[in-house]
Amino acid sequence: MREEVIRIERYNPCHRREWDEFVETAKNSSFLHRRAYMDYHSHRFADYSLMAYQGERLVALLPANREGNVLYSHRGLTYGGWIMPLRHFNVVVMLQVMDAAVSYLKADGISEMEYRAMPHIYHSYPAEEDLYALFRHGAELTVSNVSTTIDLRCPLHFNTGAKSSVACARKNGVVVAESDRWADYWQILSQLLKERYDATPVHSLEEMQLLKSRFPEQIRLYAAEKDGELLGGIVIYSIGGVLHSQYTAATPQGWQYRVIPAIYQYIIANAGKDSRYLDFGISNEDRGRYLNEGLVLQKCGMGGRAIVYNTYKITLR
């Protein structure tokens, strides 16, 4: 009997339960793909997420948004890419899914897809079927950002510089712990981004507090204090088996006391027990063409090594 052809549908709110149930059991999904996370910024991104069916069976999801005639996967998330099930799915089905999606997008006036591939550390089981499908559709690599990651199963030791930073923090009476001082931290973060980059955090304080209330176990703030004064902190997203550093900031005194390595050491020792990787995040600007070498060296000094976040462009002909 011939397999049924792939059918593409756009996500709408009536699909919410079906979407979330698929995310729960997929081999490369996380809380980032739950609608309770994706929909918090629906006012910023015109959702154009796709659902691929084989007959009546849902076989893949693509979190995505549309801007003009371009489809992005997804600009409001840490990374993009097709979400795939563990069973009854393979590269042959992925090729059929991509073919069907391209036909669907072309019919709706979309001429380009920007596909932000998911780094392999976020897979709970091998899930690179999409990369081969991109190749088959002539995808062009347009962005390559370097992140720095620790394998928490066998972490490398901090180098002399990082150890010295931790010792400095301890010598100055800095205490590190999980914190609920989100408002104080957001003030530090906002001031830092304004002074260094004339920018603001991607999330407002209200948005982050909302997400924290929805995902209390997956979103945590680890902070350094001295005599009750908040000196710095790191917001960690627990994404499957990965601890991802979402925000890092400190006060001038916090930098002087070198609190950031001390916080990371605490995270590795305490929060990292049930995770496989700690991902420090990317160190690039200008779509990967500029590498902040000093920042990379600091992360490598804490035991991190490189992975890449790649983005591809498909011209839909």
Q: Which ranges hold each PLM region?
A:
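A conserved beta-strand-loop-helix scaffold within acyl/acetyltransferase catalytic domains
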Residues: 5-55, 59-70, 119-254
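Short, high-confidence coil segments that cap the C-terminus of an alpha-helix
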Residues: 45-47, 107-110, 219, 273-276
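Aromatic (often tryptophan-rich) hydrophobic motifs at membrane interfaces
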Residues: 53, 61-62, 77, 85-88, ...
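Conserved phosphate-coordination/catalytic loops
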Residues: 13, 31, 92-95, 202, ...
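Short, basic/glycine-rich phosphate-binding loops at helix/coil junctions
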Residues: 75-83, 186-191
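A gly/proline- and charged-residue-enriched helix-loop-helix capping module
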Residues: 77-124
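Short alpha-helical functional segments enriched in proximate histidine and acidic residues
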Residues: 22, 104, 270
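Residue-level detector of family-conserved "landmark" positions at structurally sensitive sites
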Residues: 115, 144, 179, 280-281, ...
